[in-house]
Amino acid sequence: MGFQKPPGTQDFLPGSVERWQFVESKARDICRRFNFREIRTPIIEATELFQRGVGEATDIVEKEMYTFTDRGNRSITLRPEGTAGAVRAFVENKLYGEPDLTKLYYIGPMFRYERQQAGRYRQFHQFGVEALGAVDPALDAEVIGLGYMFYKEIGLSGVTVEINSVGTPAVRAAFRGELLGFLNPIRGLLCKDCQARIDRNPLRVLDCKEDQHLFEGAPSILDSLDEESRTHFEGLQRSLTDMDIPFTINSRLVRGLDYYTHTAFEYKAAGIGAIDTVGGGGRYNGLVADIGGPDQ
């Protein structure tokens, strides 16, 4: 009996590897222009890092992580995303002691136990950037602009940018009650995943593709923003406009991770299949402190 690659993985053979090298070289070139420096972290991390950083009530932590107990009886997880490991390295190696803003990027494999479908793999490659040490919304715009330029330079046409503000933890706590008031009467109409999310992480319900038709008339988190969050979001929009980055506001865009504050964004590309989101991210003001570092 011969061996086959595990489900949800790919072999990259001569011919396809050259295309990967082209994409990676474009990513590195753009990062150099924006003064981001490369970081390489382990593909395994302590499971608690993702539980604390990504959020225990997220789909990633609840259903998608590859986790095992090693011979030292430690719970270890193959990294499902790059931010938590990059921030862990930032804290552990005390990069926050540097006088300037820390701007990092990484390229590498990530692992999630995804349901097999077109465009979804259990081992996938991620290019990400992290900018730590500044609260200016112009930095959020710079990160969004870097990604937008990357897609243009690799030849991906028709890319659009969607943005939202998810506010501060206090804003989300207040909005949570308002949203539950809308969702509870239609709970029985929601898909099984959303019914499970309502009590633990109701904002994630708004991200559901299957139930979007039920959310007409849902409250908007933008109406709940405090002055700090509103000022930050307005500053982001001005900076994107100054950079000639076209964008639309999507008040239901919340992303699937718990660490975001203020800015959330996604890149969409038409004509690439059923899954049109090709990238995304956001700001995470509290993540460094959550992982044991100083407030950033």
Where does each model-flagged region fall?
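TRNA-recognition modules of translation machinery and tRNA-sensing kinases, especially anticodon-binding
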Residues: 1-296
